[in-house]
Structure formats: structure tokens, C-alpha cells
Regions:
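Ligand-site clamp/hinge motif
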Residues: 116, 213-216, 244-298, 433, ...
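N-terminal lobe/hinge region of extracytoplasmic solute-binding protein
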Residues: 25-39, 47-106, 137, 220, ...
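Gly/Pro-rich hinge or "lid" segments in bacterial periplasmic/extracellular proteins
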Residues: 81, 86-93, 187-261, 271, ...
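Surface-exposed binding/hinge segments that line
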Residues: 46, 150-204, 224, 229-231
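Detector for C-terminal structural segments
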Residues: 27-28, 32-36, 55, 231-240, ...
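Aromatic- and charge-enriched surface segment that lines or borders ligand/interaction sites
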Residues: 100-145, 169, 273-276, 331-333
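Extracellular/periplasmic solute-recognition and catalytic clefts
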Residues: 139-142, 146, 228-239, 265-329, ...
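Alpha-helical secondary-structure segments
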Residues: 52, 128-137, 165-171, 223-224, ...
């Protein structure tokens, strides 16, 4: 029989930490550490160097909760920050993160965790059980002005129990099957020492003017990087804790997060950013459009092998998205109008003619890739102007104005603005606008700067919004369609749509223990949303597609099932498996000066292509 040693036991032997359990900790727990999943980083990785990238707008806050926090910069502050445990990117098994061991209680509600004894915040303070119990104090406080978190951590998390400095338990508010219990109880710690209030007149343990006080005060990081420098409106620099970062005592972190600094410059125009990339001022660039992958890479730097191209497929679950219709706005509360809009929106033509078939139509407005939770019977509506016109006429839009746009008897034009956040999307929205005219529908273009656009949508000011959301393994519906969030700002019910039947199903879905029944509820919810026509399904990219200078090195193969980005190209959602080879950087710079060239490189990885 193969003998194994848990990570906690190994660390205790190495560092002399005591692992004696508190007296009231259940004695019969089956502790797990799961150290035998395959590694996905390269032992050849080298530490050091500065990675240069860009964002199009400066964040409105460094908070990760409260007003304006759910913006495009948020992944930089969350996605590299560890939780108690994490999923292996290929096998999806739970593996250690901050916790070196975990155990399930026999009540179907409780999960116990032991913290890695080396775990520290970036400011040097140890990560303790208090940082997990503090999560409830923080997330339940009204001072953070985050109703969704207030509700979730009150209703879905019953308690967090501290046994000693390294041992704690999280108790779910409901009994849950093993598949989702860890998803609910797996927490990201919050540094209690950092948030100790200076003014707390309501005695809830949180700074009274939290939103303003912490707006640009980034919290210490449990991950490899922390905010080191900030020039408002211009740049942000993340710095690595160093080679002695506690995470490297976890074997799954070895050879990852290798660069010493990540410098992010604000460049408000994508074309200008691409020019900076071609000059070597940025290290990688996301090739999300057909032109960027094709014509824009037909330059000397690519042809002479200085810059490489990569296209690798993944199997990441896809979240809800496309055109979100705000039913609180005039006319959009009418089902016939919404059905007409769906049939007059030519996403299929957009994919074929503008995006050259590089992307795939999203069949389900609530996303796909959730296994048996996904309602495979739902199909995206095909472009059909004649059918769209029939719906518009049922809604009273039987007349056509001199500009070709339909009007009703009250003189209202069939016209709606599409809010979107990036200039490179303008040709796509313009195509939808031209095609919609065939049904007498007008789309106007409402381009708003990146972070401001999401704030605009969160405040429910939009008519139609073109955006997509991320998702978890088990899909969520409460935030999008429960009546609690309808017609209120700063939450994710972007459509302001809800019904009593949806409320009932959503609550049944949230509390259902039986997996098969839960999946039935999920499919019913998706069917109601699809029939309501409040989201016109957009498109999806099941791959990572980037360009990078040849001094950036990647594992072979580079892709896992969960790889969305190879590099932090404008967002921090990569797995940190790349590194900078300074000798290759010098070689490349010298070659460019002397005129020496290398073979052009295009890498295609299709192992996870569906």
C-alpha cells in the first residue's frame, strides 16, 4: 500500500507547529489534503522581471465590496487571492490553498479547515482563524453598503467557528450535498487587523464611513502580489511578496507567479495600446478580434519571430450574457417588444461576417458548460425580420416613420440605446444596428468608458446593455432574477425582471439538497428566462488567444481546461504559469537592432476543443 503524508503533517514536522485539536473539535474527522493531483506549472520557470500590461480606465475604487466595486479591475484584487481551498484546473478536485487540510462534518452543513502554518498577509501579519470568522462581521455589516453580500452571508452562512489560531469551521445555512457544500463554505479570508475600525458608533465592528474611508486603500494580500504603487489615473504596480512567499510551501503553487512586478498603465485606446505592444512597451496583447489575429499581426515583429501568437482552447463554464433588456424602461416591459428585439438582433450574421466565425453563438442566455444544470433544449433565436415585425405589430408598432423606424399610435419610436464599454465593439454594435433596421427597429450606440459603463448598468440607467458575466461551476440565479434585486441599484438584476414563479423556483433551487431536483429547478428557471426574452444570447470565446514577445515563456502544453488567459493581459485571470527569460529579452533586443530574425511562431493547442 502506498503511504502518504498530509500537507499539514509535513509542514508541522518541518516548522515545528503543533497540530493538536481543540477539545471541542470532533475527534472522528477525516482530514484531507489531496497532494497527488498533476502539476501544471513548469519546473523550468525563472523568478524575476517586470511584466508590463495596460487597462483602458482607472478603477473607481480598490474596494472589492460596496458601490462601484464590481468593475473590470476587480479581478486584479480578487482572482490571485487565495481562498481556503481551490479547484485543480484540470481534474476539478479540491486542492490546498490557504488551508492545508479540510474535513467534512456529518451534518451536511459543516466543513472544517486547518490553515497552512506559513500563511501570511503581504504586510507580514499571520493569517489566522480570526481572518475567517471576521468574514461574517465584515459581510453582514450595513456599513459596507453591499446588500447582496449582507443577504448571502446572513442567509447562506450560519456561522464561522474558531477552534484555535489555525483551525476553524464554516457552517452552511442549509444542508447541502457534498458537491456544493464546499462551494458555499470555501471562503476568502479578510484581514481583520487591517479593517479594525477607528469610528464604530453602531458597534458592528466595521468603520462607519467604510465606503469612503477605504475607497483607495488596497487591503493586504494573501496571494503572491499586492498593490505597491499607484498613480491615480495613470498607473498601478503590483509587487511580488518575494521568493519566500508562504504559498510556495504549497506544492501546487511551485513555479507559478514568477514575475517580480506587474506594471499596469492606463491606455484609454486599444489601438494605441497595440502600438505600445508592437514597440515592446507591453509584453502581451489579447487578440480578441479577427483583425487582431489576422491583419494586425502581419507586421515585421511577428514575421521576424520577435512576437509569437497563441490560440488555445479551454472548457471554462460560460456565464450569462448578450443583450440585457431593462424592463423598467419604457416599452421594454412588453413581451412582444422583447420578442421582436430578439428576432431582429442578428448575432449569427455578426459572428459570420464581422467576427469571421472566430466565436460561437451562445445558445442559452444564462450560459452553458454547467453539465446537467444546463437546459440543452434552449436555443438562441435566429435572425428573422419578418417574425420580428409580427411581434412589433402586436405591440402596436404597425406604422413606419419616414426614417424607416416603426412608431405606434402615440408617436413613440421603436428605438433603444445599446450601452457597451469598449471602442473596439463599435463595429459589432454598428452591424447589429444596420440589421435591426430591416425590422423597423433602431439601435443607438451608447459607448461609455470601461469602468463607468458597468457603474451605469449597475445603476440601471441602461435600456439595453451588451455584456457578459462570469460564472461558477454551479450557476446562480438569485442575483439576476429574484424580486429582491429588481428595480434597485448596485446589484446584478440588470433586466429588472422577476415573477412570483421565478422567486419560488429560485428559492427552491438555492435550498434543494437533492441534486437531481436542483438540476430540474435550474432548467425550469432558464426556460422562464428564455421565454421572457430579457436577455438576447450573445456569443462566447472558448479559448485563450494572445500575442506575446518571445522572452515570455510558457509551459508545454500551456493550456488547462480552466485557462482563460496565458498572461495578465489587461486582467488578472491567468494561472501565473508564465515567466520572463531575461537572456532571451536581451537576445531579442539585440537581434532587432542588428536585423537578425527568428522563425515566426504560431502555437495552436486544441486538446480541450469541444
Amino acid at each position: 500500500m502506498k503511504k502518504t503524508m498530509s500537507l499539514s503533517a509535513l509542514l508541522a514536522m518541518t516548522f515545528g507547529s503543533s497540530l493538536l485539536m481543540a477539545a471541542d473539535l470532533p475527534a472522528d474527522l477525516n482530514w484531507q489534503s489531496n497532494l497527488h493531483e498533476p502539476r501544471f506549472a513548469s519546473p523550468q520557470a525563472k523568478f524575476g522581471g517586470t511584466f508590463h500590461t495596460y487597462i483602458e480606465s482607472f478603477p473607481q475604487t480598490f474596494r472589492v465590496v460596496g458601490p462601484d466595486s464590481n468593475g473590470r479591475f476587480r479581478p486584479w484584487l480578487l482572482d490571485s487571492r487565495p481562498s481556503a481551498v481551490t479547484r485543480h484546473p484540470d481534474t476539478k478536485a479540491w486542492i490546498p490553498d490557504i488551508a492545508s487540510e479540510w474535513a467534512y462534518g456529518d451534518d451536511n452543513k459543516t466543513v472544517y479547515f486547518r490553515i497552512n502554518p506559513n500563511a501570511k498577509w503581504s504586510d507580514g501579519e499571520p493569517i489566522t482563524s480570526e481572518d475567517f470568522t471576521f468574514v461574517l462581521t465584515f459581510m453582514r455589516s450595513k456599513d459596507i453598503v453591499a446588500p447582496w453580500y449582507n443577504t448571502f452571508y446572513t442567509q447562506q452562512i450560519e456561522d464561522v467557528i474558531q477552534y484555535d489560531e489555525r483551525t476553524f469551521a464554516v457552517v452552511s445555512g442549509e444542508k447541502r450535498n457534498a458537491e456544493e457544500l464546499m462551494l458555499y463554505t470555501n471562503m476568502r479570508p479578510i484581514p481583520a487587523h487591517f479593517y479594525r475600525p477607528k469610528k464604530d458608533e453602531n458597534h458592528d465592528g466595521i468603520q462607519d464611513n467604510f465606503v469612503r474611508f477605504y475607497n483607495f486603500k488596497p487591503e493586504p494580500s494573501a496571494g503572491p502580489y499586492y498593490v505597491d504603487d499607484m498613480k491615480k489615473g495613470k498607473s498601478i504596480t503590483f509587487k511580488h511578496v518575494g521568493k519566500d512567499w508562504w504559498g510556495y510551501s504549497n506544492p501546487y503553487y511551485l513555479h507559478r507567479y514568477n514575475v517580480e512586478k506587474i506594471r499596469i498603465k492606463v491606455i484609454r485606446d486599444k489601438d494605441i495600446a497595440r502600438q505600445h505592444f508592437e514597440k515592446g512597451n507591453l509584453d502581451s496583447f489579447w487578440l480578441d478580434t479577427p483583425e487582431l489575429w489576422r491583419e494586425k499581426t502581419e507586421t515585421a515583429n511577428f514575421e521576424q519571430g520577435y512576437i509569437h501568437k497563441f490560440w488555445g482552447y479551454n472548457q471554462v463554464p460560460i456565464g450569462a450574457g448578450g443583450l440585457w433588456l431593462n424592463t423598467a424602461k419604457p416599452l421594454l416591459d412588453q413581451l412582444e417588444v422583447r420578442k421582436g428585439i430578439a428576432l431582429a438582433t442578428d448575432f449569427d450574421g455578426l459572428i459570420e461576417k464581422v467576427l469571421r466565425g472566430d466565436v460561437v453563438r451562445k445558445p442559452n442566455p444564462m450560459g452553458i458548460g454547467h453539465g446537467d444544470y444546463t437546459n440543452a433544449d434552449i436555443k438562441a433565436p435566429s435572425f428573422d425580420p419578418a417574425k420580428a415585425i409580427a411581434h412589433f405589430e402586436k405591440a402596436g408598432f404597425s406604422q413606419i416613420g419616414p426614417d424607416g423606424i416603426r412608431v405606434n399610435e402615440q408617436g413613440q419610436r421603436l428605438s433603444f440605446g445599446i450601452t457597451y464599454s469598449y471602442g473596439y465593439l463599435t463595429p459589432q454594435i454598428a452591424y447589429l444596428k444596420e440589421q435591426a433596421k430591416l425590422a423597423g427597429l433602431e439601435f443607438t450606440l451608447n459607448l461609455i468608458d470601461g469602468s463607468s459603463a458597468f457603474k451605469y448598468v449597475l445603476e440601471k440607467k441602461h435600456e439595453l446593455s451588451f455584456h457578459s458575466m462570469g460564472t461558477a461551476e454551479i450557476p446562480a440565479y438569485w442575483e439576476y432574477f429574484h424580486s429582491t434585486n429588481a428595480n434597485k441599484p448596485q446589484n446584478n438584476n440588470f433586466t429588472n425582471f422577476s415573477t412570483p414563479e421565478l422567486d419560488r423556483l429560485i428559492m427552491a433551487y438555492r435550498t434543494e439538497f437533492d441534486l437531481e431536483k436542483k438540476k430540474v429547478h435550474a432548467k425550469q428557471i432558464q426556460a422562464i428566462v428564455a421565454d421572457a426574452g430579457v436577455i438576447v444570447p450573445g456569443y462566447m470565446r472558448p479559448y485563450a488567444r494572445e500575442a506575446f514577445w518571445r522572452w515570455l515563456q510558457i509551459p508545454q502544453p500551456a493550456m488547462t481546461k480552466s485557462t482563460e488567459f496565458l498572461f495578465p493581459s489587461g486582467t488578472f485571470r491567468d494561472l501565473g504559469t508564465y515567466w520572463i527569460d531575461e537572456s532571451l529579452k536581451k537576445e531579442t533586443k539585440a537581434a532587432m537592432k542588428s536585423g537578425k530574425s527568428f522563425a515566426p511562431v504560431t502555437i495552436l493547442e486544441e486538446e480541450y476543443k469541444l
